[in-house]
Amino acid sequence: MKVNLPVHKGEVLDVTIMDLTYQGMGVAKVDNYPIFIENALPEEKITVKVTKTTKNFAFGDVEKINQVSPHRVNPKGRVYRQTGIAPLQHLEYSEQLKFKQHQVAELFAKVHMDDVEVLPTIGMANPTQYRNKAQVPVRQVQGQLTTGFYKKNSHQLMPIEDYYIQDPAIDKAIVVVRDILRKYHEAAYDEFHHSGTIRTIMVRRGYYSHEMMVVIVTRTKHLPMADVVTQEIQAALPEVVSVIQNVNSKKTNVILGPVNNVLAGKATIDDQLLGLTFAISAQSFYQVNPQQTEKLYQLAIDQAGLTGNETVIDAYSGIGTISLTMAQHAKQVYGVEIVPAAIDNARQNADKNGITNATFVLDSAEKAMAKWQADGVKPDVIVVDPPRKGLDADFIKSAGEMAPKRVVYISCNPSTLVRDVQRFAEYGYHISAPVQPVDQFPQTPHIESVTVLEREQ
C-alpha cells in the first residue's frame, strides 16, 4: 500500500529548523513529518532539497540558509562534514557543550527520570587537534597511493592532509609515510579486487612523552622494500620509536589484523596519565583525547569515594588505565578484560609503576563477575567503562547481587547509560550525584559522562 507522504524526493522547500538530533543533524517538520538535514542549526530558516524519503522521515540537503543562527561559525572545510570527521564544526563550541548536556538530560527525561541533574559539559580550552591516534585508509586515487578519509556512506576516498581534530604531528607523520611509500612504488590496497599491499597507515603519539608509533597495515605478509622504508621513516620522523607492520589478509572492514611484526624499535610506546606511565601497543584501547581523559578519570576516582580501604572491581579494564590510577587510592583492585594483549599490557603497566595491589584476569566481564561472586569477593566499588552497547543484563545481575556500596559508570553512549541505570534500580541502586558529561570528542556528537549509583541502605 502506497503511503501518501507530505514531501517527495527532489522537492525544494523552505523550512525552519526546530532541533538537533543526537547525531547533530537539524530537524524540520512538514505536517509533523520530520526531515533530517546536515549543516543546519536550530532556529535557522533554510531552503532544503529532499534527497531521500521513507515512511516515517526524510533526509535533505541545505540549498540556502535564509536566516542564520547566531551560534553558527564558519566551518574549516566541507570535507570534515562530508567525511564525518567533524560533523559539529559549524556550531560554536560553547553551544556544542550545551547540546551534549541537553542530550543526556533529555534521555533521562524520556524515561520519567526528570529529577536527574545533568551538569554542564566539561569542555576543552582548544577543542581541535586533540586526537593522539589516527587510522587512515590508503587507496589508489588517480594513479597514485593516497591517504584520506571516506566520504560518508560511500567507498569514495577523499584526499586529506590536515585532519583538524588530530595532533598536527600525527597529520605530518601520515604525509611523510605516504610520500615514502609512494617513492618506493608500494601498491595501495584495492578493496574490490582484494589486491595491492598497503591498507592503512596508523600513527599513535604520546601526549606527554611525544613518542610516536607508525603502523603500516598490509594485506600481504611481505612488505616490499621494508628495510629501506623503515629507515627513511625513522630518519624523517625523529619522534618515531616504533615501526610496526600489521598483517591483515582478510577481506574485511576491520582495520588491524592479528599479526604484528616490529620492523624497528619497540613494540609499544609510553605515555603518562595522572602521573603513571603506560605502555601502549598497536592494538591497545587507549583513550584518544588524553587531556580530557585525565579529567574523566580524576572525576571517576573522586566519585568513587576511596579512602584507601576499599576493594574495587574495574570491568572492561583495557590496559589498566583506570585500575592502576584507582589502585593508588584503594586497598585492592581487580581488573577484567577480554582482549589478551590488553591484559598483558595491564600487567606490564602495573610492574612499570610498581603497583602491587592490582590483579588482572582475562575473561568477559560477565563471566569474571560471576566467578568473583562465587569466590566471595566483596567489592566496595565497581567501576564500569563499557563499549557503546552498554552493560550485559547478566553483568548487572552479578553486580547487583555482589552489593557494592557504589557503582561508578563511565559511559560513551547516553542511551545505554539510561537503560542500564534503570536496570540497576531493580537491585536497589539510584543516582546519588549529578551526572557529569565530559567532552572527549569535540566537533562531534559523541558524549562521555560519569554517573555514580549508590545502594539504598
Curated annotation (Swiss-Prot):
InterPro entries: MeTrfase_TrmA_AS, MeTrfase_TrmA_CS, NA-bd_OB-fold, SAM-dependent_MTases_sf, TRAM_dom, U5_MeTrfase_fam. The active site is at 412 (nucleophile). CDD domains: AdoMet_MTases. One of its GO terms (molecular function) is rRNA (uridine-C5-)-methyltransferase activity. Gene3D superfamilies: 2.40.50.1070, Nucleic acid-binding proteins, Vaccinia Virus protein VP39. This is Uncharacterized RNA methyltransferase lp_1151. Residues 6-64 form the TRAM domain. It comes from Lactiplantibacillus plantarum (strain ATCC BAA-793 / NCIMB 8826 / WCFS1) (Lactobacillus plantarum). It is an enzyme of class 2 (transferase). Its EC number is 2.1.1.-. S-adenosyl-L-methionine binds at residues 287, 316, 337, 385.
